[in-house]
Amino acid sequence: MSPSAVDDAPKATGAAISVKPNIGVFTNPKHDLWISEAEPSADAVKSGADLKPGEVTIAVRSTGICGSDVHFWHAGCIGPMIVEGDHILGHESAGEVIAVHPTVSSLQIGDRVAIEPNIICNACEPCLTGRYNGCEKVEFLSTPPVPGLLRRYVNHPAVWCHKIGNMSWENGALLEPLSVALAGMQRAKVQLGDPVLVCGAGPIGLVSMLCAAAAGACPLVITDISESRLAFAKEICPRVTTHRIEIGKSAEETAKSIVSSFGGVEPAVTLECTGVESSIAAAIWASKFGGKVFVIGVGKNEISIPFMRASVREVDIQLQYRYSNTWPRAIRLIESGVIDLSKFVTHRFPLEDAVKAFETSADPKSGAIKVMIQSLD
């Protein structure tokens, strides 16, 4: 049974699509960044020859640059995940289905989808208990050695492609960072009226702030070292209180100033989105007795924390690894307008200018919140 694939001028949502050469954004252990030919080839996209059972071919439209993408480029690793050869980046993507294997019935050519960037084994305990983010054999796109989504075309299992209807391509790509925040909210168990601290006004911190606000956190405080990022936080969430972190202060001193921003109330839950040792320590010092510090951010392999402060105050410390079962919820939140990410994309680049896009994302002076790469016109 041969795959059902696009022709040289395939139809999708009523318009002809020409298949261009497939190119991708690569890095390597030498920290080079470049654009080169990628798989599947244009010929394979046209014929559907590379499609496996259960897969569809997606013409990627928009991909956001994540901090982890920049980290793999600059550092060559995140913990034990090491770039060992030529490696394609990107895992925040949405696009259009342009070819469907005959075994797939859930999607058809022309469907607009967001790509959940993992492939799991469906056999290990985490998979069988619904926590597939802990899959022992997971292939997470853009995490070495699995190539990422910063390409024009990609084959992906249909089960991990979520229909987004008329949602914009950019919002479809932003479902991935929203899923990170939702996973944190779900496990941190933020409740109506909880005083919530969000550490870090980067994309994940900002999305987490919006989620906490939607969940009824009150009061709500967000911290950062950047005045411009805090101003952006206030713009998209007027009721948040912003708190600029002063570099050089001890964690205990920082905690006291944070509690002052709460009006003397100690946070019940902290959504720590930086992974920075000093920020985690300050959050522990600031927490109420029986409070929780939930670490979403990615940090160093080993850090020091104020252990006895956490002990005598019974502060729960939890951590997060990616997400599971969040995408349908994320889609509903954006479609309904409960979460508005329309201002998040501050910079846009075509795929051909991806190197400049990465330089912009990595430059603190650029003012970038989310840099979006558009793979196709």
Curated annotation (Swiss-Prot):
Broadest EC class assigned to this enzyme: oxidoreductase
Keywords assigned: Arabinose catabolism, Carbohydrate metabolism, Galactose metabolism, Metal-binding, NAD, Oxidoreductase, Xylose metabolism, Zinc
Cofactor(s) essential for the protein: Zn(2+)
InterPro entries: ADH-like_C (IPR013149), ADH-like_N (IPR013154), GroES-like_sf (IPR011032), NAD(P)-bd_dom_sf (IPR036291), SDH-like (IPR045306)
Maturation and modification: The N-terminus is blocked.
Residues given in the record as NAD(+) binding sites: P203, I204, D224, R229, I296, Q320, Y321, R322
Pathway(s) served: Carbohydrate degradation; L-arabinose degradation via L-arabinitol; D-xylulose 5-phosphate from L-arabinose (fungal route): step 2/5
Top-level division of the source organism's lineage: Eukaryota
Result after altering A362T: Alters cofactor specificity from NAD to NADP
Subunit description: Homotetramer.
Name recorded for this polypeptide: L-arabinitol 4-dehydrogenase
Organism encoding this protein: Hypocrea jecorina (Trichoderma reesei)
Gene name as annotated: lad1
